[in-house]
């Protein structure tokens, strides 16, 4: 079974997305970046449930660090937080959340406020959460010690090896995707990752074109599986079984 653990289905044009989903067999975790993103992913999931029983879409609610400035003030409004908590209760896991000191224009203070708000929920409910760490790896590593019952999944880590080793020591699962085949650093991290902490992703539809590739279709996850299999020198069928087992350990 193919499992794409991190995508942004709401970024696609629906007239391009739906024909692909109707042919896909597997599981797609549809990460959200804010409220509207989550509601769009839920609508996509509802549509595909009626047209392709072999394609399971899992919408997850989160607020990306890029959206922190707009959303941090909303967390002081009880009506809004009640609505957000309803979305969180509906989500089998939480994401995309985190901090970004490289590309995000949101203030570090607002990023941390939003991140901690979600971590507090995950800590209370023991739900898994998918975390964006770009250039904020050390800060996030320290913050996570305040939430021992949250269950982080680290998305597309490409930071310092020292912090990666600490994340592995804590047992945080790691996603690897389309950049892995292009990066010796990521390949070294992949090879040092216990197989029971490994997940695959595409971060579709923007990541592959951002890296200079031409594809952004949902079947790109097949190529990611093949590339990870090659790098790890593991038969593709064995890797599929490992990733499926890891997925079910998280959800």
Task: State the predicted function of each range.
Residues 1-251:
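Mid-domain alpha/beta scaffold segments of enzyme catalytic cores
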């Amino acid at each position: 079974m193919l499992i794409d653990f991190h995508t942004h289905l709401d970024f696609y044009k629906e007239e391009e997305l739906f024909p692909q989903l109707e042919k896909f067999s597997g599981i797609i975790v549809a990460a959200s970046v804010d409220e509207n993103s989550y509601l769009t992913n839920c609508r996509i999931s509802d549509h595909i449930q009626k047209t392709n029983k072999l394609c399971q879409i899992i919408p997850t609610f989160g607020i990306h660090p890029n959206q922190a400035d707009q959303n941090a003030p909303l967390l002081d409004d009880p009506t809004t937080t009640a609505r957000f908590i309803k979305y969180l209760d509906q989500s089998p896991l939480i994401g995309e959340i985190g901090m970004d000191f490289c590309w995000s224009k949101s203030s570090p203070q607002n990023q941390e406020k939003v991140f901690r708000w979600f971590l507090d929920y995950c800590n209370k409910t023991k739900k898994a959460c998918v975390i964006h760490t770009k250039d904020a790896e050390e800060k996030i590593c320290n913050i996570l010690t305040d939430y021992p019952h949250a269950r982080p999944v680290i998305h597309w880590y490409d930071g310092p090896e020292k912090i990666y080793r600490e994340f592995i020591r804590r047992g945080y699962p790691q996603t690897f995707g389309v950049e892995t085949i292009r990066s010796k650093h990521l390949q070294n991290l992949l090879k040092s990752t216990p197989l029971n902490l490994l997940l695959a992703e595409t971060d579709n539809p923007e990541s592959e074109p951002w890296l200079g590739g031409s594809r952004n279709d949902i079947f790109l996850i097949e190529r990611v599986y093949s590339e990870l299999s090659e790098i790890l020198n593991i038969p593709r069928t064995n890797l599929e079984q490992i990733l499926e087992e890891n997925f079910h350990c998280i959800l």
